């Protein structure tokens, strides 16, 4: 099997297993490079931008965990560490760097955005771990009855 064929197969497999995760990640990339947003009443909320970052990344990582837990019977902690925690944080950093350097000043990269993103990812991981424990507890409880 050639590398190109393997890559396409892997992508198709991931798309089938994690469609909502891929949709969330794609949406983050799109929203990160939209040159402007219309004004809303929420603009007056203090730190609304940071809350938005936290919710986007926390929600995305929660979705990654939920889709993972639906497809797997056991946790691969190493895989989850890399793909459901580290990769989104690295992606966030890359996006912030690209916003600062490649958007003709229509967007800016900010350290506090990166911090909000990383906090969201970490909260998403905590939610995922809690869901994993609930899944194991329910499985164990059903086995006892």
Located regions from the model:
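Bulky hydrophobic segments
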Residues: 2-112, 118-145
């Amino acid at each position: 099997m050639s590398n190109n064929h393997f890559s396409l197969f892997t992508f198709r497999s991931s798309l089938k297993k994690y469609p909502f995760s891929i949709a969330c990640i794609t949406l983050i990339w799109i929203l990160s490079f939209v040159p402007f947003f219309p004004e809303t009443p929420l603009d007056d909320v203090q730190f609304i931008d940071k809350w938005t970052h936290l919710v986007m990344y926390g929600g995305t990582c929660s979705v990654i965990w939920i889709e993972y837990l639906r497809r797997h019977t056991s946790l691969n902690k190493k895989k989850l560490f890399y793909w459901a925690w580290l990769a989104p944080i690295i992606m966030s950093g890359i996006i912030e760097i690209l916003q600062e350097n490649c958007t003709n000043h229509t967007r800016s990269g900010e350290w506090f955005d990166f911090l909000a993103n990383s906090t969201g990812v970490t909260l998403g991981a905590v939610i995922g771990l809690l869901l994993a424990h609930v899944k194991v507890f329910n499985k164990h409880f059903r086995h006892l009855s």
